[in-house]
Amino acid sequence: HEDALIVPEQPDKYNILTDDPSDPTQHFIYQFYQKYQTVIITNPTEADYKFNFTANNGIKITAPEQKQEIIDEGIEFLQKVLLNLYSDSFLKKNLPFSILLSEEVRMASYGETTIMNCYASSSFIALGNVSSSLETMTDEEFVKIRADVNASFWAKYMSEVRGLFTISDAFYEASEEVEPKLYDPNWYRFKGTDPNEIDFYKYGVITYSENSYIDEDWPDFNSIYAPLKSEDLAQWMNFVFEKTPAEIQEICDKYPVMKKKYDVIREAMLENGFDLSKLEL
């Protein structure tokens, strides 16, 4: 990979050149590197992630507990949550230099710390949640994390880092045809105070803006705002990986504006060799 930044100090720092067929995880890591030239790092240190080219990227990664069963489960989790969704040719073309298995990925920004399911930079993707709690993760939690990881992969890595995935204005124009002021810089406020009673799909959006004011005890004072363009796209990216194609089809049949926006995302992904409508979740 041309953007590979971290050159191992010793010939096989990450133990990727040694095959051990009796150890399924080591065998997988070895084969994965042979096939994709991508290093799976199971015990990341600061040197593996601290700097993104020359800028400090502001993240702190906690390596997984180095117990065999946790690393084994982490590899399985990586496959289920990301790798299995894509074809070999797509992965060969689009994986970064390394994938970091992490117990926790924290991002510090403006004095606030966010725990992330996934972080993408020019040379690596860090996957969080690799811990003993994988054993007790519910299906519902898994679906949400998988959606978030893939949304992050496309929005951050494929779009921001590599510039390969771009969404045309038609995406936002579809919603503006329904409500011209939806993305008003002064905030478009939905009529109604109960978010459960607002038909967001009618506007082509998934839900309300995180800048909304919602108090369950005093619903009359609620202010429910439409998402900003950036929020709208981020919510959609999670949505297309959280719902099955059949569920999305049903929603698109009922709401033409949802179909228009889904098609814009699908077309942009098709240009990168991935067919969202054939996604198997």
State the predicted function of each range:
Residues 104-149:
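Active-site scaffold of zinc-dependent metalloenzymes
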Residues 209-281:
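A cross-kingdom marker for long, charged
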